[in-house]
Structures are given as C-alpha cells and as structure tokens.
C-alpha cells in the first residue's frame, strides 16, 4: 500500500496544519507528516487505512502503546502523530502535541474498567506496567496456551533487518517485537533472516558460548527425578534445539517459573550487541561535531552510536550529560554551557538551531555589512576645514567608505590590510603598489601575472598562486588596458590576457542580473545561482533548495541574462532569502571560469615496471548510477586542474576505480585500486628510515610548523609511466564507451608516491637550505619543522620566503595548519621554546578491560616512557600473552593493578624534556627496577633529561643481570646513534671488578662502550663464579637422571669418588628435569667445595651461563645452592662411553626406567606427534608401534586431550560431492571445503566473505580435484552471481542446505570443529593464522588414519577417485560389449543359432544370454557381430562375413 496523503480533507486538514509540533515551538504539522506516518505504519506491520477514522487511530494507539518504553525515537514520533490525528478526527480542540497526549491519557483513564475486588485491582496495577504482547495466553479453563508469532510481526522483523542492516536500532526493535516470546518463537524470527550469514554465524557462536556457560553454572542434579517433577532446562533446551514447545511453555508457567524465553532473548541481545559493534565500529568518543555540521545532525549521530555502546544505562546517562556538550563545536558549546548542566535535549536543540558553519557566519557578516552600508554622518563631512577636495575615507578592514577600520563592525580580517597576505601587518608591508581592496582586482583593468619563460614549456599549468581565472578564447577590451602610470603592465603572451582573481580575499564582484546590479560571491562549490530579494520580469515557479544552514524557499526564474565582467551568460536564477548572493557553477561554466591548482615544474623521477612485466589490465567492475555521476564530476574537476588527462583506445592498460562516501558527508571520494599496478611497479627505497625525535632538536629562538597541502597532487608523474595509471569511468547499460583517463601527478594509493614525494621535497628544499644556512628544516612527508635563532620578525619573514619558494614549485602551505605560536603540535609531540613533551596522555578508567584495551594502554605507556622515567608494563603485557581475541575480557592480577597504579602516579605530574646542545657531552644513566625491568635517562645536564626509556625484554628463560644490562646498553647506544649521531658515556650500576670478570669470558659477545661506575642501588653483581679447573681435594659427584616418557616416572642420583651414592624416584618429570634434579642433589649433599660431572649438555649450558634468575623453579633452587658454595667446578663427559663413575650412575638411575625406551621407533613417533599431533593409528602404522604404546603417546599429550579422540567414518556419498562453509577464528574468515566421501579437507584464509573470493576458491578446488556438486548454506557469498558464474563455467551443480539445520551441512560443520581443534594444537608453531590453517590441513589429510579402510583422508580420496575411474571404464566396456550380438553353434548341430546377447568375452570362451538362458560357448563356435537391427540367420547370413574382432577391441 502506498503512502496516504488523503487522510484528512477540508476543515480537518486546516485544523491539522494549525497544531504545533511542540509547546511554544514555531513548526506546525504538515501534509508530509501524514505521508511519513503511513509509511512508518507499514514498517511496523500495521494497516495505514486505519488512519482514516478516529476508531482506527484508537486501535493503532492501543497497538503501539506497549512498545513505547523500549521503542526508538521514530516509534514515539509516530505515536505522537497518531494521537494528534485522533484528536482531529474526534473534533477535540488542541494546540500542540502535548495537549493531544494529555487528552488521550484522560480518555484512557475514563474508560479504564473498575476492579471488582482489591486483589483484582492490585493485579491490574501490576499488569499496567507490563506489555501485553505475550504469545502465552490463558484459556477459560485456566490453562496456558501458546499463540505463534503472527506473520505481521515476522514481516516487521524482516523489514527491520533489511532496512537497518544491524545498526543500533535493531536491538530495541528486536526487544519490542520479541517480548514474552518462547525460544521456538525466537528461533522462528532468526530463521526468517535469509542473508547476513556471517552475522548469524557470530550470533550462533555467542549462543553456544552462553549455553555452555549455563551448563557449567547449573549442573544436572544427581539421581532420578521424582514423579511429575519438571526437569531443569539445559543450555540447549533454552536455545530451543533439544526442547519441545510444550516443555518451554511448562517451564515459563511453572511455579516458580524458569523464564527460558527471557534468558534466550538476553543471549540473542548479547550476540546482536557484538554484531552491532562490528557493523558500527565507531566509538562514542569519536563522535564530534564538525565545524559546519548542524547540531541536529550531530545529536542524531551521537545517539545512534550511543545505542551501540555496550555500557550500563548509568554510564550512558553520564556520556549524554558530559560528552554531548564536550564534543560539540565551539559555536554550539558556548551556547550549551550557558544553558547550564540541567538543560533538556529540547532546549539544547532549540538554542543551537542554525548555529555554526558558513551560514551562521554569513548571517553575522551580512548584518554587520548592512549596518556599515547605511548612510552615516561623519565628522569628515564638513570638508570646508580642509584645503581642496579630499577623497572620502575608506576602511582597510571591509573596504567600504565612510568609516575607519577601528570603528568597523565587520569581522576582523587576518593578515595585512594592504596586500592581504598572512605573516605581516600593514605597517611592515613591502608590496608597493598592491592594494587589497583596490578596484582593479575586481574589474577588467586588473594586473596580469607574468607567464613563465618559453624554456619551461613542459609544465601544464604553473600559476604562482592558487587563483580563480575567468578564462576564454576572446581577448578582453575596455578602457584602462594600458594601466595607470607607474604600474607594470608587461604581457609576455597577449593571447593569455585572462582576468585573474586572487583568493587572498573572498572573490566578490559586481554583476548585472537582468536590469539590476548586485554584488555576488563567485562560488565554485555551489550548483545554483541564488540572489537575495530581486525584482525580475517573467514567470517563476516555487522551489525548495537545501544549503548548509537548512532549507529555504526560492522563486526560480529561467533564461535570465547575467553580465559577469563583460561576459554574458543565460541561465536559471533563484531569488530568495539567502545570506550571501552567490554565482554558482551553472553560470560560471558558461563564461569559462576555472579554479586552477598549480602543478610543479620540477624534474620528474623516472619510474619503470619490474623486468618482464607489463602494465595492469584489470577490467572495470560495474558501478551504480550515483557513483558513476560522482566520478564523472570529480574527474572533470581534476581534468580542469591538470591532474589527469583524457586518453584514447590506444592505451591497453586499465585499473579499476570506485567511489565511497566521505565520513559523515554526502560528498563522494574517488578511490583507485592500484594493487595490481603496485605488484608490477619497481621497488622503491624509502629515503627516510624513521621519524625525527624532538630530543635531537637543537634549542632555537624561533620556531614555526608548516603542513604541505595537496602534496601528492602537486608532484608530477614520469611521462613514460603515466599510461600505466589509466582508468575508465563506465556508463550505465553500456550506453556509451567508457571515459578513459590517466594520471599526470602522483596518485593516492600508488606504492611509489611516498618515496618520490619525499625525494622531490628534499630537492626542492635544497636551494633554500643553501640560501638560508641559519634555518633548520626537519622534513617528514608533508610536515615541516622550521627553527632558527633569528628574531621573531626576521624568522617569520624567512618562513614566508620558504612558503613562497614552495609555492613557486607548486606546493601550498595552508594557513589552517600554519602554527606560529607555541606550543607546537608536531609528530605527536608538543614543542615549547625551551622544552618538549609528548601530547597529553590520559589513561582510561575502566571496570572491564579487554585485550584490545590493554594493547592500547600499553601503547600509550610506551609512548609516555620517552619522557616519564620509571614506567613499567611487564605485568600488563603478561595479561595478554598468547593468542587471544581482541574482545576477550582480561582479569587483572594484583601485580598488574599495582603496576598500573604506579604508572598513573608517574603520569600525574607533567614532565618535559630539553633540547640537544652539541657543545655538551651526552650521558646515559641506567637503573635496575627489579623483576627484569630497567629504566634509563639520557641527559647533558643532571636532572634535565633529553630522553628517557625503559627495557624489559627477557631473551631466554635463564639469564642474569649482566646479560640484561648489556642488552640495555646496546639499545641505548643504537638509539643515540640514530638521534644524535654519537654514543653517550654510560653510567652503569655495576662494579668494575664484576663487569671485567664477566667480560673476560664473554668479550666476543658484543661491543663494549665507554662507561663508569655509579653507586645507584640495587647494584648488579655476579652471585657466584664457576672454577675453570678441577678443585684438588674436593669430593667429585657423577650425576645422572632418566625418565620414562610415557609414564612420566623418573629417577635422579649421584655416585661419588668416595663411594657414596643416592637415588631418588621422581613423579611427573622429564629427562631434562631429572638431570637438573641430580645436580641439585649433588649440591645439597656436598661441602663448601665440589666437583660435579654430568653427561647433560642441556644442564651444562644453563649453569655455565651463570644465571641469577630463572622462570624454572628447579633452576632457581640450583642458583640458591651455587650462591652458598665457595668453589664449584662443573664438567661434562659424553654418555654411555664407559667412563667409570658416569657408567655406574647411569646403570643406577636407568633401572626400571629405560626398558620401554629400547623399543625401536618410539623417539621418532614422539617427535612426529610433537610436530603433527598424529592420532594413534597413524603412529602405530608408520612407526611399527604396539597400539598401547601409540595410545599412551597420545594420552600423554596435553593438547590432544581437550575433547578426546575424534570420531571418524563418513557416509558413502558420490565421489564428486563437496560441502563448503565459512567459519571464523581469531577475527578472520576460513573457507572450508570437505570431500564428503573421503573426509579430505581443503581450507584457506580469505580476506573477505565475498562472492569473488569464494568463486576464486571454487575454481582452484575444481582445478585440483574432480568437483561435480558443491553443497553450501544460503550465505550471501555462496548465493552471489559470481559464484553461480564460476559454477556454470566449471560445470558444477550447486545445492543449498536448510538454514539452521545442522544435518544439511553435517560433514563440513563437524570438519570445522576438527580443523579448529587441530589449529589449537599447533597454533604456537606458526606466527600467522593462514600458516596454521595450512599446517592443520596437512595434518588432517595425511597424519590422521581411521574411518573407511583405515586410510588417511588423502589416501582415501585418491583410492575413491581411482576406483571411480576403474568402475567407469569397466562400465564403458560392459556397455560396449552389450552392443554386440553372438551367433553360435551348439554341440554338433551345424545350424547357426542366435542372435544371442553378449555378456562377457574371454580368451577361450564367451558368456551369452539366449532367451533368458546364460550359456558358455567356446570362441571357435561363436561369431560376434555388431547389432545392426533384425537379420535373418541362414546360408546367406551376414554373420558369415562379419569379422568378430572388427571394432570390438
């Protein structure tokens, strides 16, 4: 049903349009509100026809009222409109919406039925706060009966998903539509969502997680249930998969009830929240009002994002009270703060209506200018006091006559009042003869700039400034072309005598419209020409136009002649209440007016493709009409500016383009997919290897920070390479050939643009640096830091020279990002005249921390550690060790909470760094903080740090302070060389004797800097020293340990040269732990001096590195014992070589331990399982192990006992059937394909769940294996046209499963779980997920045996395909044989019989079937011929001449 506009007629419509939307407001109801209401009713599955009568409106109000509490703002607006409409139909006199709502409330209270008894009244009062939208209703007999959801409710839910697509409004809409529903109803709602399979998969995973959590917290009661008692629901019962509708109703209506429907709704809402966060990733903190954005639009964005935030209502209320005002633009914020803290949203909207942006400023300017233009009486009107006639005074600020600049009411203009340029005042202006407001700038007698000399013809456009040209082919004529005396009017090329308007001021000129003269602004951003109240002849028609300040009503006059600077244009003029007269593009294009951007005349950098490669030839994909129109408009402007050029069909290259809408804007942005060109383009060397650091800056008296605008588009591209950047704008339905362009400048997104721009900028700045050696310029991409020791005026003059120098080469430096006064914001730092710091850092306060929150927190702390000494993050980093999802909640340990609290205290006091003085020495001081964490300061004067930092890496499990100190020194030295070009003098907390004792043995490890000792506790020392020679007279201990890898039982012991021996049994150990345990026993049983001999290289390596800390408890105990000894000698001998004491102790500890280790293959099987986690069948088969041994290896692996051994066995399906599905892991998408008959697996991580990626995967699969049928779910990627086209081309039949029916995708669903399980077992062996996926696929296909035939999946698929080929060939042979007939003679009967059917042909006989009898006939008595139809057997029979071997073999 369409939108209804005829609900009211006659007097009712007049009454409707006299009612105000708000009390005290200005806006009234209009016809459009009725149309909107009817459309909204269709969305909510209500009949718009009910709006025609009062009774119908009452029914609609009763239907919508229960959902008001949880509904959106749109629902409330609809309810309000219907309430007003009801009053109009009922002839109830009201003046605004609030009065209508009051009347409705009165009516409802009057018609409210009186309760018969107090209990009924109490029940009614209780029910009044509860929605009556319950599918469970009570019958007359008192039984609770379930009413299924109506098709109208389901239709409303589907429309919500289609229109909103998981925006934040979906959650309250779902809550409203599903109130009181059973799990079966909720599953019905979910099943109606056909597309969005990725979102549904996420929802399914959340429901599974919540169901598992429910089962953990609600264990099954022990023992049988009493008769008649309901069982407790499990998680799967609540989700509606293992419970019936009757059970759900029984739980919900029991006493006490179990609200399974509400619990399931809560789970679904949790999943929807996660989906909404993915579809709406913008945080509420990022919602800020733009300088030109209306307050109303900002509030809409704010509340839309607020609904998506996962926070409590109290937190959301706080966000509304603080962030809404805090993030408004300055114009609105000033008004909002004036309203006070208790202001309502309505008051805010009213106060900020029309505030901010160009429209607001234009109105202020227009008011000021109108006051200025009023005739005023000035003291200078009495001119009789002066000799001669003087010219009237003129304002330098606004250019009007009659007042001085100090009395001007117009907004103050920045820059010089004489020439209009920034950077100096009028009294310091050196631009003689140039007047900012002189008439020549807006008339034909204007200066014409000098064109470049003829030897620079290569440049396309090279104006000295960005200017607005009124260009054309004709020459201008008029008086005053010769110019005034003293003015330079030299023209290098007469044919280019174009009028030129600089943009140092607003381009306002005088134009003649019809017969009237007006001042108007030339606006290249406006589509239409709009003039304030003007009397024009001819017919007009009303029109509504939208601008920055809102909609205004105008009169449209067509075919109006407009004279602009002597050029005439005929077009449409709109007349209405505009704050500024505007000449738009509809007239500017007729007179040839262009906005010219300079392209630099610099030498281009030659670029080539990689050897052997050609340019990209990627077809342009289809685009929508609005995108094509947007791209045409953008490219037309770029072509006028010389950035791109049109090309013909001779260029064979193409790169696809597309368009996206800019953030929070209706404008489009052009994007070019240069991925293919980037692959083929030569590699570039980044000329800048890092970003500059403020600690390396020398202190300067004057500083300025600049930003280069339109950087890439001001830099030319190599002419020979331009052809490879070609792209095409297509047309709808191939109406016309596509428009072809190529780039003339560096394109955005191309790999060479950054390096070429940096190199070009360096060449451009080189002559300026030579000319001004006193100026220091730090350049990083388009950010420029300019420092000098000149006086401020001289410095700013030099900066203007730099800006002019860049401008000559085509690089502009916008005033908006020109920082003249400190503090300067540069590269994330805040620079002051004598100090620097990082930009303000505020650590978030959170009750719940996720992995992503911790990562951001650690990043902030690392950034702050540049200047804040003492910051530590080791305990915080421990919280997020391992592979975790970004949204996983993290529980703080006590150590991490303490560390964060200490960091907060450190950041409370702002700290600053100083600048570098080349005349002073660099000093680096290092302190030990404990727990493997170090901090350092680099300074030139004590307590004035240039830079600070921290170090907390532990490169091995067993280390000591000396090792870590060496690593800190190496880091600080490298950092100093990068920033200052030299190494500092180190002050280390270690005594010289300890340091030199270490370096005596480890001098070859690294380089030693210059250093001195500083007594800063805690000091670094070596806690024990190992002897280099055996200790004479000390007892010698031969130590050894052994462990059984299967039982984890072991022994450790020692034998001494004095006859002592000891052996202990150890549980749950390994060979390496047993060896260390033996050394610990020797140290505990020995005296102050001891010699120890071991055959373990592992133990020898740990102890010889002299660690003083370790993550191993056993090694820590050994360290404690070593510190107690006076002298220790440790030696190693090879095992099992007949060495006396070693052999004795080896026999001692091996007794009862190493028996099973003599089985061949166990070591190899263990290594194979550690790497691939093979199942026991594969190991038993590959390494000839008994099944019990192989099973024990699997049982001893902690990673293989998560869910037990996988179940195997597949349905014997057709060999060509594959099942495909997408699963999600670590936030990435894995596309899985399973060969149903064999269980063989193909999987791949794909960048996006799109049809294109899926089709590419299917084609790769079809290229490797015979694929006849693919079975998928109904996901949008599988149902896409791209996949259908790929299946058609590869002759693959596509079948679809049933949504939410796991049996339809059983093979691939179970394989998804198996794949994730294998990935979990080997994830720590791979850095990237895509590597882990391929490793898991290899393990599944070739390292797991079982199922049909006891094969691996790889062997099984090969066997199935080979068998299928053989049976197909055999069937072909059988069919061939059956095409022949046999004539035969039986016994001695000379008459040929037949024809009989040939069943099989052997070497000596054939098997035939004749009249149902199967006979074996010798070959010599049979004649085989092809069946040519009916033949007569006899003497002249064709059988006698037929060769039986003809066409038979």
Swiss-Prot record:
Domain Peptidase A2 residues, every copy: 518-587
Keyword Lipoprotein tagged: yes
GO BP annotations listed: DNA integration; DNA recombination; establishment of integrated proviral latency; proteolysis; symbiont entry into host cell; symbiont-mediated activation of host apoptosis; symbiont-mediated suppression of host gene expression; viral genome integration into host DNA
Site residues by UniProt (Essential for RT p66/p51 heterodimerization): 997, 1010-1011
Domain Reverse transcriptase span(s) in chain numbering: 641-831
Chain residue ranges for the region called Dimerization of protease: 499-503, 547-553, 586-598
Notes on how activity is controlled: Protease: The viral protease is inhibited by many synthetic protease inhibitors (PIs), such as amprenavir, atazanavir, indinavir, loprinavir, nelfinavir, ritonavir and saquinavir. Use of protease inhibitors in tritherapy regimens permit more ambitious therapeutic strategies. Reverse transcriptase/ribonuclease H: RT can be inhibited either by nucleoside RT inhibitors (NRTIs) or by non nucleoside RT inhibitors (NNRTIs).
Keywords: Activation of host caspases by virus, AIDS, Aspartyl protease, Capsid protein, DNA integration, DNA recombination, DNA-binding, DNA-directed DNA polymerase, Endonuclease, Eukaryotic host gene expression shutoff by virus, Eukaryotic host translation shutoff by virus, Host cell membrane, Host cytoplasm, Host endosome, Host gene expression shutoff by virus, Host membrane, Host nucleus, Host-virus interaction, Hydrolase, Lipid-binding, Lipoprotein, Magnesium, Membrane, Metal-binding, Modulation of host cell apoptosis by virus, Multifunctional enzyme, Myristate, Nuclease, Nucleotidyltransferase, Phosphoprotein, Protease, Repeat, RNA-binding, RNA-directed DNA polymerase, Transferase, Viral genome integration, Viral nucleoprotein, Viral penetration into host nucleus, Viral release from host cell, Virion, Virion maturation, Virus entry into host cell, Zinc, Zinc-finger
Protein name, entry field: Gag-Pol polyprotein
